[in-house]
Amino acid sequence: MSESQPGASSTTSNKCDSGFIPGDDTFTQWRNIFSILMGKMTDEGKEQFRVARDLRNEAADCKRCEDQRDYLLQYSPVIRYLSDNIRQLGGDLHSHNIYCRRCTNRKAGGFDPEYGILLCANEMKDQGHLEDTMAHEMIHAYDHLRFKVDWSNNLRHAACTEIRASSLSGECRWAREFFRRGQWKFTQQHQECVRRRAILSVRARPGCKDEAHAEKVVNEVWDSCFRDTRPFDEIYR
């Protein structure tokens, strides 16, 4: 009996500290949801809840992501257009190297020149979000083949491809900013979104010193990279 007491104490302590109650049954899940709605769960508890939910739904999330990925590869005009242009440059992106996985670092996706594209299945809100994410990463793939991007050592290269990916993928269109991110400005909204997301991305790179450094690099390449809409004739979405 004495051996079980520390575990029980730990569970009680965890609940008191964060407000999160471990458990996969429906009753426990609803208790956690109500705790969040009532403002009784800490940020740490909310993250514990999200991790538990993502683990519980991993198979279903990945299956839905794969089904939507395959549909978009076949029927989405922007995804098909980018696929064709990547193929013309000697690349090949299809279901065999566009992976749906559960991610732990709260990002939507990523591109790696060796392995392909990662789609974070547990972060996808809907098929539109998945389409924007695929388009974003496919523009990185296009840039890698077309412009020989130095991902590791050149922050200007990284800033330029982030500007282009955010501008051309559709993730910065007005409706997405207004309804998803609470950005309610009507003038210069697209440019501000692109700039903001490019700075955040550059800031996260190892060679970047701080936010001021990231902003400086983005500003240095802004004019030429924002105007460059290749492979599109203009901003498509």
Swiss-Prot record:
In terms of Pfam families, this protein maps to: Peptidase_M76
Q: Which domain of life is it from?
A: Eukaryota
- Tell where it localizes: Mitochondrion inner membrane
One Gene Ontology cellular component term attached to this UniProt record is: mitochondrial inner membrane
Q: Does the keyword ATP-binding apply?
A: no
State the active site: 137
Binding positions for a divalent metal cation? 136, 140
Provide a Gene Ontology MF annotation, just one.
Answer: metal ion binding
Q: Which UniProt keywords apply?
A: Hydrolase, Membrane, Metal-binding, Metalloprotease, Mitochondrion, Mitochondrion inner membrane, Protease
Q: What class of enzyme is it?
A: hydrolase
Topology of this chain in the membrane: Peripheral membrane protein
Q: Which BP terms in the Gene Ontology apply to this protein?
A: mitochondrial protein processing; mitochondrial proton-transporting ATP synthase complex assembly
InterPro entries the record matches = Peptidase_M76_ATP23
- PANTHER family per record: MITOCHONDRIAL INNER MEMBRANE PROTEASE, MITOCHONDRIAL INNER MEMBRANE PROTEASE ATP23 HOMOLOG
Q: What does this protein do?
A: Has a dual role in the assembly of mitochondrial ATPase. Acts as a protease that removes N-terminal residues of mitochondrial ATPase CF(0) subunit 6 at the intermembrane space side. Also involved in the correct assembly of the membrane-embedded ATPase CF(0) particle, probably mediating association of subunit 6 with the subunit 9 ring.
- Which family does the UniProt entry place this protein in? Belongs to the peptidase M76 family.
What name has this protein been given in UniProt?
Mitochondrial inner membrane protease atp23
